[in-house]
Amino acid sequence: MAALSSRILIVDDDVETCRLIAELVAAPGRELHQCQTAAKAIELAQKDTFDLVISDINLNGPESGLDVLKAFKQAYPGGEVVLISGFGTLDTAVQAVRAGAFDYISKPFNIAEVRATVGRALARDSKGGTTAEQVSGVPPEGIIGRTAGMLAVYKQIAYAVDSMAPVLIQGESGTGKELVARAIHVHGARAARPFVVVNCGAITETLLESELFGHVRGAFTGAIADRKGVFEQAHSGTVFLDEIGDMPPAMQVKLLRVLQDGEVRPVGGNRTIHTDARVVAATNVDLDRSVADQRFRQDLYYRLSVIVIHLPALRDRREDIPLLIEQFVRNASARTGRHVTISPDATAALMSYRWPGNVRELENTIERLVVFSRGRVELADLPATVLAAPSLEERMFQGLPSLDELERRYLVHVLEALGGNRSRAAEVLGIDRRTLYRMAERLGIALKDDAERAT
């Protein structure tokens, strides 16, 4: 087993971070080495053999962790590399995985994640696992976020780009599902080919069939010429099927056939056309429930959900809101020629709002604020819906009973448990009977006298 004789090199320009990682991954049979520069790590990789390299991406000096990865994979293709970064973004996650990294971990560390990742990397090294081929860096797509939920999304995108399998993106309206679909396309081998979008819930069944599969001249009224469907248009590219959960049942059958056979038949046509388009679908509905309710085909669901990416709602990643605000203000300011800032109080209120429309609603709100701003957006400038929302602190205690209500419930519970015996109740509560009477009167509780209890 590799774990019995594993040599691990830890690379970080911070000595304390190196020591911390070493403590986390130390185990019997593991030989740990540390260095603080990419140059030293590359030198060691060329002179010695390691089963695993754990390196920060951002290192002091001209070379980065990606350079360490490249040198190590050239010197020892059978080894594994885990990259670490304190500035988790989609670009770094994709570059790391596609450059051949086994995995990508963000700071601050999750102890269990670090240990599990190292264990899996050593296990795969012992089996001679393969890695992704090296490619160049990639441009940003406008996906913003550093919370754990978004870092998980970045990892899923990074794994999806090198696969030709269908992808299902789940998330509420406005969470950025099309952005994720485009990111998968532009990072993959099909980036130079078409990316075609179809909203399955926005057009009728007849038009949807023609949109997807095309039609021949005379197939229906108004079909005055042959027309290619999106699967033919996107040959060797990507078809993005938005709102797939709203697709009519009859169309689900035909889509399933395309996924199974790689062929489409235009409406009114008598021949099939081969298509090599990759399918990325998105939905804001619970497809598991739709399958259970027989509104969505189970076999199609299985075909589409080979890779599943779940986008968190904005309310579940509030820490990303300031980053989003900053980007949206920058974009809107560039379009309008205005220099606008958002006050801390306004930012806090924007973070407190639940954003039912998610990122799209936030972006539209910021756009309006910039357009009508006189230079600085204050709390009073925010929409009434945002101002009316409870603060984070208020929402934390929302729905909790008042102290009087808790006191009342407790007194009723004690009295019922003791059969209404006032003396025993006072004793249990640690008060005298007079205080018990005053408490009951204040809380609106009628105390039965001994005669009433006897009956």
Name each region found by the language model.
Residues 1-2, 19, 47, 364, ...:
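Bacterial C-terminal helix-turn-helix
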Residues 3, 15-33:
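Two-component/phosphorelay signaling modules centered on CheY-like receiver
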Residues 29-39, 44, 418:
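Short hydrophobic/Thr-rich beta-strand motif most characteristic of the beta2 strand and flanking loop
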Residues 48-54, 59:
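Active-site beta3 strand of CheY-like receiver
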Residues 109, 156-221, 232-248, 313-318:
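Conserved post-Walker A coupling segment in P-loop NTPases
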Residues 111-172:
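Flexible nucleotide-interacting loop at or near the entrance of a catalytic core
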Residues 112-120, 188-193, 268-278, 285-388, ...:
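Nucleotide-binding/hydrolysis machinery
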